[in-house]
């Protein structure tokens, strides 16, 4: 029998008061593709109004999944973990969906907004882990001594200045997925080749052609199918929001970006020239002429420690809610 004040009692009370022990989304351990898959399926089972589908599987068989909530006319897409060592953005998206779903089920609020109003107004499509192969390498789910680890290490040996595996951003074929989109891809190739990234490796290799990787093809196809009003592409780090495509500014994008900056405390900034080509946000703005944002969450050196998650979530919750609703007219 538990006595008042014991550790067991405190743990039980924590469960009964819906603390972190009851949460489906783990925010205390590194994210892996298997944990992401398990989490999404548990969320869909717990909240039947959530939907999921597999967009593709990677060259090594890992699924790239969506997780969707809402039935509103305004469609938005939030993506995360385009880069392997930026995996902390995956639980950011998953936790947001979990808290929104719980608030919908309990007729509650999220960030001061009635949750049911959010899902009536918007349909929020998310791709929580664009690069599951790379994430598994960085987080240790691909163990030393395995064929996949050895193959990645051989590619990494071409770039000895990049720490392995923590410096890995690419997929396991050594292609940087956020340099795969047809928005100045040839210019991106020129820039990255001039920097020495001429062959597959841990980061910054653009591939042999735009959209020639399963993951980037799947996200581009999905985006064209959904035809969203807005996209958020989550990366780390720097506490910066990038909002335009070179000199082109989508009407209304700055005002919404300024609101994101106000809510998060992040800086709204122009994308540095050498990083202005072939990214997902760049392609979306070029093709759709609608607001797209790359958000560099958190601060420090990638991969960011999981201990930084509470701050990242707190800073970005307002962005995630506001992007779904847009600015008041």
Where does each model-flagged region fall?
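Short glycine- and acidic-rich boundary segments immediately preceding or forming the N-terminal edge
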Residues: 15-60
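Positively charged N-terminal leader segments that act as targeting/secretion signals
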Residues: 2-12
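Short beta-strand-to-loop junctions in surface cap/lid or active-site-entrance loops
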Residues: 66-73
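Surface-exposed patches in mature extracellular/periplasmic domains of secreted proteins
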Residues: 52-56, 106-115, 268-273
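Metallocarboxypeptidase
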Residues: 54, 184-329
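Conserved phosphate/anionic-ligand binding catalytic regions in large, soluble enzymes, centered on
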Residues: 83
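Active-site/substrate-binding loop(s) of hydrolase catalytic cores
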Residues: 73, 88, 95-97, 101-242, ...
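Conserved beta-strand elements of the Class I
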Residues: 75-77, 293
């Amino acid at each position: 029998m538990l006595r008042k004040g014991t550790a067991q009692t405190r743990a039980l009370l924590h469960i009964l008061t819906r603390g972190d022990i009851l949460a489906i989304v783990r925010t205390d351990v590194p994210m892996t593709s298997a944990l992401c898959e398990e989490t999404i399926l548990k969320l869909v089972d717990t909240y039947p109004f959530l939907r999921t589908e597999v967009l593709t599987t990677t060259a090594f068989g890992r699924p790239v999944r969506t997780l969707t909530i809402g039935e509103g006319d305004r469609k938005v897409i939030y993506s995360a973990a385009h880069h392997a060592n930026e995996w902390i953005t995956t639980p950011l998206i998953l936790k947001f969906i979990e808290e929104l779903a719980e608030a919908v089920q309990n007729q509650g609020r999220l960030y001061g907004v009635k949750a049911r109003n959010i899902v009536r107004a918007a349909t929020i499509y998310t791709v929580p882990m664009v690069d599951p192969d790379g994430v598994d390498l960085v987080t240790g789910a691909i163990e030393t001594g395995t064929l996949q680890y050895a193959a990645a290490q051989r590619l990494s040996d071409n770039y000895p200045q990049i720490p392995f595996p923590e410096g890995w951003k690419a997929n396991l074929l050594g292609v940087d997925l956020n340099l795969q989109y047809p928005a100045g891809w040839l210019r991106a190739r020129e820039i990255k080749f001039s920097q020495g990234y001429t062959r597959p490796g841990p980061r910054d290799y653009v591939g042999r052609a735009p959209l020639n990787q399963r993951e980037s093809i799947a996200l581009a196809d999905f985006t064209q199918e959904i035809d969203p009003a807005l996209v958020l592409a989550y990366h780390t780090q720097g506490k910066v929001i990038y909002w335009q495509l070179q000199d082109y500014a989508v009407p209304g994008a700055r005002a919404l970006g300024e609101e994101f900056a106000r809510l998060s405390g992040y800086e709204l900034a122009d994308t540095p020239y050498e990083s202005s080509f072939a990214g997902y946000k760049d392609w979306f703005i070029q093709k759709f002429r609608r607001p797209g944002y790359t958000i560099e969450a958190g601060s420090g050196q990638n991969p960011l420690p999981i201990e930084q998650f509470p701050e990242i979530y707190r800073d970005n919750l307002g962005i995630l809610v506001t992007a779904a609703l847009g600015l008041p007219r």
